[in-house]
């Protein structure tokens, strides 16, 4: 299955999502020329981008992202950080789970630290 087909199937579950929204999410994550390839031939970074495209396609007010930058090269990390910052500037609420302190420092306003499934600290970041 291609990346485009993957997004089309997901979009078919929500009648409000059309080809325009699919194309926009593909462009926003930088997969435009690669979407005709089978997903099985995608690198880990390309799969991460596809996952982010799936998440933003519906234009949700809340995004839950679990290690969204894992597996991306330096260029991809930079691009996806910019995308996430842009989504925050649009007023989206983003719940981001990450072990990467750089991602946390650059992207998070409020940080909740957990240990063994228990919240141990909440702090406000000055971004």
Residue ranges and their predicted role:
Residues 52:
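Hydrophobic anchor residue at the start of the ABC signature
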Residues 98-99:
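H-loop/switch region of ABC-family ATPase nucleotide-binding domains
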Residues 63-66:
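Catalytic Walker B motif of ABC-type/P-loop ATPase nucleotide-binding domains
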Residues 1-13:
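Q-loop/switch helix immediately C-terminal to the Walker
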Residues 59:
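Conserved catalytic motifs of ABC-family nucleotide-binding domains
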Residues 8, 17-34:
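Conserved ABC ATPase "signature" region
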Residues 74-75:
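Helix N-cap at the start of a conserved alpha-helix in ABC-type nucleotide-binding domains
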């Amino acid at each position: 299955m291609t990346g485009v087909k993957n997004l089309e199937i997901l979009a078919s579950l929500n009648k409000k999502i059309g080809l325009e929204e699919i194309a926009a999410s593909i462009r926003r994550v930088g997969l435009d020329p690669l979407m005709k390839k089978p997903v099985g031939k995608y690198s880990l970074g390309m799969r991460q981008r596809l996952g982010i495209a799936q998440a933003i396609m519906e234009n949700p007010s809340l995004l839950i992202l679990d290690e969204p930058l894992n597996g991306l090269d330096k260029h991809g990390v930079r691009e996806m950080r910019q995308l996430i910052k842009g989504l925050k500037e649009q007023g989206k609420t983003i719940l981001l789970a990450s072990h990467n302190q750089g991602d946390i420092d650059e992207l998070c306003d409020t940080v909740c630290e957990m240990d063994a499934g228990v919240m141990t600290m909440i702090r406000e970041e000055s971004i």
